[in-house]
């Protein structure tokens, strides 16, 4: 029996208008959270309590529209927003608002008869120019007070959480790792334990068991570290059987796990027969083998080499161990690694000696390896009075951690969307005959500030006009409604967040404007019988 599916097809402006409805609905849901007076969003969850959140990522992930054409727009803009959050830790809402403004302005330009090529080129050029201006306005983050300001804004002005974030970053260092967990009571706390972060994530989204965070979280996993490719389920069947029997998660870290081995792990995981995850091996080329040996020392195991059919004598107890593993799309965190401290220190010293004679490229690889061995893991436990409150605070703390680290690396600028709006408004006032594509970007760049002002009860056009008359660094303070020097007031945004939000929003909006045809599945299915 064959099931024949059908497509519904839309063309040209009709396709773009349908996509536009989805982008607008996503933006309308997300933008209410912007600024110090932003509102919470209440989200129903099947078989779980509802979520109350001010986190743009969580809101965006929850939106799935019945209109399939509109949902295409939701998916693409959500991807751009999530990419911003993954790379900078914040800026999801800003990226969404910018993408919608750019797309709607672009649609109007196309409807007015402007050519797609003209619009695209102008938008890309203006976006690059504006990003360079943002980078040029960067102010370095030098003191703990500067860090505290960034964290305080990102965590929505909860000073106790902001202080814990700064303490956590200081405890593990700029390149160290901090994870966020739930506290058992109302109080939040910080603990530093042995562990490491791997710049590789899960190889398949089917291993995700925390959809709200797109994460695979496993407690007390048995971790197989190998330099061999695993393609047959027979290579790991005894591990899988023991994992299911003991209800202990099974993890593979290696160069490649494919074929029926990967299929068996995915099938048994999705059917809840066992918990598992497959991670890509760190580094490339000759550095990969040594990096895998580092992992073995950290996790207290040995590297499995040679023919995988000869691994039958190994049990889960012989594999690597840690208290908790959290794997995301591009990174994995091992908390409470069970390796010997003395072995880690010895290995670290060997790497330090090798760095003395290494060229620049090799030295960077060695430095990464040494950092994995030396850096502890900070566990920031977030408390609250209810499960909903704890979940909402956790989301904000995770965003704030990334944003604070981003500020340390690229500096900060005046926040609340004020810098983008100020630069854009001055450009629009000074050049009234700029190409249409450039004008689209500069008009859209004012939209985040407009929304923040609106959420705070101010008149957006009045605020924009006032800012355009002030020198750089001045902007709108949504807390008291005044125009002031935002850098002095501590209202700041990391450069990376602002830059990536604009870059990713421009990229997705330009691609959406280029759509000439869109297709979605028709719900009608034909069933035909073969001879």
PLM features: residue spans?
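Extended, low-charge hydrophobic alpha-helical regions
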Residues: 11, 17-19, 64, 69-71, ...
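Residue-level signature of catalytic and energy-coupling elements of molecular machines
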Residues: 19, 35, 89, 113, ...
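Core structural elements
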Residues: 46, 97-104, 128-131, 135, ...
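Glycine-rich oxoanion-binding loops at beta->alpha junctions
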Residues: 49-85, 203-215, 220-221, 225-238
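A structural-propensity feature for long, helix-poor, extended segments
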Residues: 109-151, 217-220, 226, 311-338, ...
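Long, structured protein-protein interaction/assembly regions in large complexes
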Residues: 128-414, 518-531
